[in-house]
Amino acid sequence: MEPLTIVSLAVASFLLFAFWALSPKTSKNLPPGPPKLPIIGNIHQLKSPTPHRVLRNLAKKYGPIMHLQLGQVSTVVVSTPRLAREIMKTNDISFADRPTTTTSQIFFYKAQDIGWAPYGEYWRQMKKICTLELLSAKKVRSFSSIREEELRRISKVLESKAGTPVNFTEMTVEMVNNVICKATLGDSCKDQATLIEVLYDVLKTLSAFNLASYYPGLQFLNVILGKKAKWLKMQKQLDDILEDVLKEHRSKGRNKSDQEDLVDVLLRVKDTGGLDFTVTDEHVKAVVLDMLTAGTDTSSATLEWAMTELMRNPHMMKRAQEEVRSVVKGDTITETDLQSLHYLKLIVKETLRLHAPTPLLVPRECRQACNVDGYDIPAKTKILVNAWACGTDPDSWKDAESFIPERFENCPINYMGADFEFIPFGAGRRICPGLTFGLSMVEYPLANFLYHFDWKLPNGLKPHELDITEITGISTSLKHQLKIVPILKS
């Protein structure tokens, strides 16, 4: 270990002890929670590859609303639909902020995106643009040709590898990346491979453990240990690529409205004005990064889980294939066909319930002191909503941890944010605005995979032997990538 690192850790340890010893002991009526260790509080209890499961297990012991002390950060975790409703509906305005983090400030241009921007007029207007212009149902439909073209390419690859194992995980990640990049940037990104590589480094950074995040007074560690310099270098790489994209869009002129990519839309909004603030290139880049980072990992992980569950349940695979092959006429699936694929939609719903792409929703922050379920929640408290625990709540779902798509037959519950037992995209003001786009990246590819190919496990593996161990980053995915064998449809 370098001498500077040793000295830094020694200084940090001393300061941590000082923070702990001198910090005022609260007398507020906080929610119950597990015992706190000196200095670190409950940080050690989140050091797990599946923190959503750890928190659900703690909630069984300490209650559906639970207080954790994560270093210097007071944190409240809610784990049931009733308490999620309290946070995201009853008191939504009080919990509409995001915590300020060094990484969101660096990567998203001082948090001028939609995901990390603080609640206020800027966020409201940018969210409105996103909802009405960028990710409306009409706009998502306009990208259908991009999805269709990419699925044709993938199908040809699978045909050439029929009868041999393919890495389904890698294939779907590449597919989702290609569609999102083209829908967002058009054909103007000359270095997509570098862009995607840096984006994944950003995603890893956002989900990685960082001691200074739990001790605001230790931000100097990010400088001394070289983390901040590394993050700034990554941000500079992204900024250079996005700057070239904006220049390319401006040089080629404006596309027709039905051919606009998302950068076209944002530049049009920037040029026409009409907002209470001047839209800058930094605002455009921040929102573009939102689009690129938010959907990539989550859509591919959902596809991976859906196919995994179908491989583990051959009777469900058979029913889904029979449906899609009876509905589709000819060699090509149209997105209109999806409206008739009722069982496939049940499969996607059940996948989102049991394998929520973001099991712990993006953290919120309490804007003003309030009371939830009889407990005091001080201002600046960090709020974690365990969407996975809500989706597997035994009081809301029978056989909650079993994969049963049929549970959604004739069931009015949906993922639009009104039913708090099923919130894979969040709810309230901070619900994911890319919901429709994300679903299009799951339903249409899945239908194609089931229509054109039969599938089997490699090396004589039995369905019940398929390893479904989880690992959590930005989203929860399989620890071991899914490898399966495509067989040409007879």
Curated annotation (Swiss-Prot):
PROSITE patterns: CYTOCHROME_P450 (PS00086)
The enzyme's E.C. designation: 1.14.14.150
Membrane topology: Single-pass type II membrane protein
Glycosylation sites: N167, N255
Xref: Pfam families: p450
GO annotation, biological process: sesquiterpene biosynthetic process; terpenoid biosynthetic process
Transmembrane domains' residue ranges: 3-23
Domain of life: Eukaryota
Biological or metabolic pathway of the protein: Secondary metabolite biosynthesis; terpenoid biosynthesis
Signal peptide residues on this chain, from the entry's feature table: none
Catalytic activity: germacra-1(10),4,11(13)-trien-12-oate + reduced [NADPH--hemoprotein reductase] + O2 = (+)-costunolide + oxidized [NADPH--hemoprotein reductase] + 2 H2O
Molecular functions (GO terms): costunolide synthase activity; heme binding; iron ion binding
Function recorded in the entry: Involved in the biosynthesis of germacrene-derived sesquiterpene lactones. Component of the parthenolide biosynthetic pathway; parthenolide and conjugates are promising anti-cancer drugs highly active against colon cancer cells. Hydroxylates germacrene A acid to 6-alpha-hydroxy-germacrne A acid, a precursor of sesquiterpene lactones that spontaneously undergoes a lactonization which yields costunolide.
PANTHER family given in the database record: CYTOCHROME P450 (PTHR47955:SF13), CYTOCHROME P450 FAMILY 71 PROTEIN (PTHR47955)
Name used for this protein in its record: Costunolide synthase
Species per Swiss-Prot/TrEMBL record: Lactuca sativa (Garden lettuce)
Gene, per the UniProt record: CYP71BL2
